[in-house]
Amino acid sequence: MITFDHVTYTYEGQTVPSLRDCSFTVGPGELILFTGESGCGKTTIIKLINGLLQHGGGGTLEGAVTVNGRDVAGTPLWELAQTVGSVFQNPKSQFFNLDTTGEVLFGLESRGASQEEMSRALASAAQVCGVGPLLDRNIFALSGGEKQRIACASAWAMGPEVFVLDEPSSNLDGEGIRQLRDILRRLKAAGKTVLVAEHRLWYAADLADRVFYLRGGRLERIYTGAEFLALPEEKRRSMGLRSLTEVPLPEPHPSSETGGLTVRGLRASYGGRAVWQDVSFTAPRGQITAITGHNGAGKTTLARCLCGLMKEQAGTILWGGSLLGRKERRRRAFLIMQDVNLQLFGDSVLAEARLGSTATEQEALAALEQMDLVQYAQAHPLALSGGEKQRLAIVDGCLSGKELLIFDEPTSGLDYAHMLEVSRLLRELAKQGLCVVVITHDGEFLRESGAQTAEWVPKERHQ
């Protein structure tokens, strides 16, 4: 059982609490879905349950959080880890090994499990989490979605009674989300207590026993699963929530437009392994071009080639009909990465928005206001929530002055309202004549943005 007794939490350096007077109880075997707008306190709840904030968060906690009758603040983390398994929004932040098999078994090795026990746990994790083909691989050569599945397998292998998952679907394709749904169903069937913080709701809403809706750090309402699924469309949108049903990806269509970016016969490899070959497509100026595909298809590798961060083995990239070398690509292109933590360098949100840009302070503040970030202008970028960091990186791209903007999963961690704002902003950038390329699994975002899906699927791909 998990209890929150009038819990208020304020992060270090902040004056406004992230969580305010929050009280609830979760019984054994329940699957609870926490949802609400970006920054509403979902991740804070997750980190209070697994003890990360009480044991090193540096903030101020009022009230009490207990798991199985034990006060989390007074229980050592190593003991909590045997009861609570965690899967974070950014799985890289919880990895300790270079290889996938070692990562799945790391917790068991750390507590001195026998070889027989580890073999059984590895086989079970491979079956339940679908990571068999990913074992014995370099963990940093995996796609974002593949890393998320390894994180799920690592938590499963430890056999905890409570599982907390923070935006676990944020980097997954449709098939990966269905696999995640199966994992949640199996956890629930096994009698585990499961708590999921999510914006993407369609895959988990019907599995939830209850849905906790947060707004501005307060637990505003608790719905039964049936009540939540019955919410009218307008009510759901007014709450800032994403679709309760899956929105399929649009079919790809080759573009007949000229100008902008043209890719012909591109081939690339990563770590000595061929990723794809003979990739060709066009991304005209003045429209949003979407690159879709399953996890591990090489979409992020393609983005790195397009902006000159990675060298292709064969093929050509043209801009306005002229050959575009790697140096020129780096001059013209700006990449908003899938893991935005890798590109936030400023010591404040405002400083980050102006870094590498000619924007004035007023222009930067206006861009931050557009992305609902101006209130955090003096905060450190890494103190923001996942969705807020994502929006800040988008501000960086918009102020960069570059002609080719490449967004790798720009709606990861975004609620409905901010997803609409990003859609509107990208449409505006396209209207200005920029070339906008978006890598995404988000069908709802593609529908709202009016993006044209490129027919880029490689003729051959080697796993």
Q: For each predicted feature, which ranges?
A:
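Helix-to-loop junction immediately C-terminal to a conserved catalytic motif
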Residues: 50, 307
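Conserved ABC ATPase "signature" region
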Residues: 116-134, 361-376
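H-loop/switch region of ABC-family ATPase nucleotide-binding domains
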Residues: 198-199, 440-441
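Conserved ABC ATPase signature
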Residues: 138-142, 146, 380-384, 388
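ABC ATPase C-loop
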Residues: 155-156, 398
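Conserved ABC transporter NBD signature motif
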Residues: 58-70, 315-329
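Hydrophobic anchor residue at the start of the ABC signature
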Residues: 152-153, 394
